[in-house]
Each structure stands twice: as structure tokens, then as C-alpha cells.
Amino acid sequence: MIRALLLALLLANPALALNMSGFRDAPITRLSAEELKDFRAVLMKILDETPDGTMVEWKAPKTPFTSKVTPLKTYTGGKFPCRDATIESDARDRFQRGRYTFCKEPNGEWQFARPPKK
């Protein structure tokens, strides 16, 4: 259920679907549905407001989970703004760090996109 909720909340656009096998044992699977919703809201705010190179840390209110999000690069991908970001998450028994690309859709929502260009 958490995997389905994660997919629905973070990867809502089916055109940008992600292979979830890489997230099966991810720290984010430890979050409750409400915490996952909160994390998504924080991530959207970070992508909207945080300058490149600035790390923002978020801690789940109940679950032992901490995530550090650092926007790295802002650019235009086609017609829409995109941002590469590093997300480092730790849920005590699980740790994951990756670089991800998000692009802003016409509806104003940031969506997970293709892997970032190096």
C-alpha cells in the first residue's frame, strides 16, 4: 500500500513513471501516509523556493526519518522550469541518496522526470 501511495503522491504523472524497484527498500517506505503527504508538500515548497546549493532538512513528526534535499541546478527543460536535486534520506535502518530531476508541469506541480544530465 505504501508503494502505491508513494507512486500516487510523488509520481502522479504516468508519463513520467519511475521503476519502483529501486524504491522497494527505500527509507521513504517507512513513512505513514500522512507523513508521506507532508514530505511531498515540503519537497514541492523546496523546489519552488530554495536557491540552488542550499540544503533543507525535514524530519518526520513520528517516524524516525530525516531527509536532506539540496536543489543543485535550475534550468528550462523545453517550455517548463526543471531542477536537479540531491535527496538524502535516512530511516535509521535504511539510507538512500540520489540525484533526481523534477520539472514543473503546466498545472504548477513539480513532477519527477528523467535522470539529470551530467
Map each language-model feature to its residues.
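Sec-dependent signal peptide recognition
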Residues: 1-8
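N-terminal signal peptide c-region/cleavage motif recognized by signal peptidases
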Residues: 12-14
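N-terminal trafficking/processing presequences and adjacent post-cleavage segments
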Residues: 16-60
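Short beta-strand segments that buttress and anchor functional surface loops
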Residues: 57-59, 83-90
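Surface-exposed, charged secondary-structure patches
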Residues: 62-81
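Hydrophobic/aromatic beta-strand elements that line small-molecule binding cavities or substrate pockets
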Residues: 69-74, 86-88, 98-103
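Short, cysteine-centered beta-strand-loop-beta hairpins and adjacent loop/turn segments enriched
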Residues: 79, 89-96
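Short beta-strand edge/turn micro-motifs at domain boundaries
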Residues: 105-118
